[in-house]
C-alpha cells in the first residue's frame, strides 16, 4: 500500500464566529498554550501533528489576506525579532523549529470563499495522484493515547486502504453541527465501519430516521472528527460537484463529494481515542485551551487554580 506523504489543511475561512478577534487575525492563527508550555497558533499544532505522524509535505489552503502572514510565521527569524527576545536559547530553538516546518509547507490561495469542497479541490495539483491526509484547520486534536490522532488513523488505513474518515461519538442534540454518517461494522477490525450513508448537518429527525448505528447507544451518532484520508478519486467527485454547480448556501460542500464516494468506492470510518475541539467558536476555543492545559506542563498549576475557585461548581 502507498505510504502517505502529503497532507492538506483548510485554513481559508473568515472566522466570523470569532469576530472581532479574527478582524486582523486568521482564526487558525489564534494562540494557544500547547502541552509543552509554548504558546503557538492553532495552525502550528496541526502541522506538528502531521509531521509527527510521518507526513513530509503540507499544503495549507489560505485566503489572499492571510497568506503573507502565515508564510512569514513559518519563515526565518528577522533581525528585529532577535533584538526583542531576552531568552536567546528559547528564541533560536523555536525559530529553528518554525523554519523547519516552513520548509515542508506550500500555501494554496482560495481567492473566493466558495466552501470547503472548493478549498480541497484547489489542492489537486499539490497532491497529484497520491493518497493524502486532510485536516480542518480550525480543529485542535488531542489524543488520549501515546499515539497522536493522525497516527491512529494511518494505522487503520494500513488495513483498509480506500477512503477513511475519523469519527467521534456525538449526542443527537449536536448532530446539526456536523457531517454525520452511518454504516456496517467490520468484524475483523474493531471500531471501523464500512460507510453507507453521509448527511451534512442533519436534523435530529433525519438522524433518527436514517443514521442510527446498532453498535452505538440510543441518541448517539458518528460525526466527522476532522481527519480524512482521501485518494485522488475525491477530486473527480469535487470536479463534478463544481461543474454541476451543486452548492449549499452558495458554497461547495465536501460532504457532497463524500456522498458520491460512498456510492462508487470503498469508504470506511474509524473511531479513534481522542478529541477534536473546534476553535472556530468561542466555547470550542475555550475548551481547547483548558484541554491542552490539563494535558500539559501546567496541568498541576491549572488544576490547583481551578480548585481554589471552587472547581466547576456553578
Where are these regions (language model features)?
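A short acidic, often aromatic-flanked loop/helix-cap motif at beta-alpha or helix-coil junctions
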Residues: 37, 112-116, 172-174, 204-207, ...
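Conserved beta-strand scaffold positions in the cores of enzyme catalytic domains, especially
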Residues: 29, 107, 163-165, 267-269, ...
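Residue-level signal for inorganic ion chemistry
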Residues: 43, 123, 138, 181, ...
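Conserved alpha/beta core of the MobA/IspD/sugar-nucleotide pyrophosphorylase nucleotidyltransferase superfamily
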Residues: 4, 183, 207-314
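A generic secondary-structure signal
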Residues: 49, 53, 122-126, 152, ...
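Conserved N-terminal catalytic core of the sugar/cofactor nucleotidyltransferase
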Residues: 1-20, 34-134, 141-145
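Conserved core of the sugar-phosphate nucleotidyltransferase
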Residues: 142-228, 232, 236
